[in-house]
Amino acid sequence: HPGGLLDQAVAVADFFLNDGRIISTKGRHQRSNQIFNASWGERVTDIPIAVLVNGRSASASEIVAAALRDRGRAIVIGASSFGKGSVQTIIRLPNGGELTLTWAHMIAPAGFNLQSHGIIPAICTSSPDNELADMMAAIRGDLPAAGTILNAALASRSAIRSNPDLARERCPPARAERTEDPEIAKYLLEHKSLYTRALRDGGAAIAER
C-alpha cells in the first residue's frame, strides 16, 4: 500500500489495539508535536495477525505496521518498507499558490523514526541469500524443517535489529509482490509457537530518540 491519510491509519490500527501509543509526530514547531493513542477497548481480540509489507509500503501503511508490531499485536513479513515517515503541511501563499512544507517526522511506538528506515520485517523474503528458497521448500514439503528454518530466520533478524541500517541492507526493500509471503504468513499463523516467537523476536530496532 503506497500510503494514505494519517487519521485513517490511526483508525485502522485502533481497531486492533486496546490502548496505548499508535504513532506520534515530532517537528521543530510546537504544534507539529502530536501523540495518537488507541481508544480503550480492543475491537478484534484473540486473533493472530500477520502484516505483509514490501518496498511499496509507505506512509500510512507503515504507521499501521509499526503500531501493530511494536505493540506485540502482529508479525511483519516481506521486504523492508519504503520509509516515508514525514508529515507535510500546505501553506497558502498571498498570490494564490501553495507551498508544501515538511512539518514533522513520524515516530513509531518503539521510539524510532519511520523516515528512511521504514519497517524491517520479522521474516524477510527479499534477502539476497537462499533463505526464502529454503523456507518455501520446507513449508511445502517437510513441515518440521520449516519450523527450524523459520526459527533461524527470526534469529538472524533479531541479531541485527539494533542496527536498522544493517537490517535494511540485509532485507532490501523489494517492490515486487511475492506469492510466497501469504504462504509464509499462513504457516506462522497456524503454528502458535513460531508465531509467539515471531512476536517476541521480530520487534523494532533500538529506538532513535
Task: List where the protein language model places each region.
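C-terminal "post-core" interaction segments
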Residues: 1-209
